[in-house]
Amino acid sequence: MFSTKGMTAASGKEKPVIGTGNHKVKINSISFDKTPYDAQAYNIMLHVESEPVTGDFQGFLKDMNNPNGPRYEGQVGRVRYSPYPYKDSVLPSGKEISRDTEVQKAMIFLAEALDKRAGLDAIQANTIEDFMAKCSTLLSGPEYVNVCLGAREWENTEGYVNNDLYLPKLSKEGVPIEALNVENSKLLIFDSNNSNHLRKVEKKNSPTTSQFEPSSAASGDDFDL
């Protein structure tokens, strides 16, 4: 079967960075990252890897300081569990949102997709940071799940459009992550015209268009392991 997904006209190779769309991925690790603009807001970051890519493919080094070391066999990427960071807040309706409670709910959903709910319930932690570190140990591994990866586009200083990947919000339309081989799947199907899946950026110096279609020279996904 022939497919050009992930290829560029410049090289014909699959990119080492995973992109938007529907994929099977495994979770190599989970980090709980403080946002640079708000010390009370955190992102749950899933460090994912696709199924092994065959053919003329070279994945990123697992250790950037060891140029002769092993490489990832699949495409990799950092995926925010939610389009928005987790933070204590009060909605206009007056409803209070607890950061830690929402984080725990997210991990419950992920653990159930991986069939690891019992292990999650066995975790004992004194802080949310400790809880998330233990979740990373439990929920990372070789098991694959189906995901729908959305993104917020952003333009770098060289004018290339890149993707800040995230899992689209769970809604009546479906779920962004699901176990393999689920009967009556509710997995979201990626739709580039759905703003829940893709938040497009308007290219600078291109006032007449709100959609950027990269050329072979402008495939500028930045990824720093």
Q: Predicted segments — roles?
A:
Residues M1-L225:
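Short beta-rich binding modules
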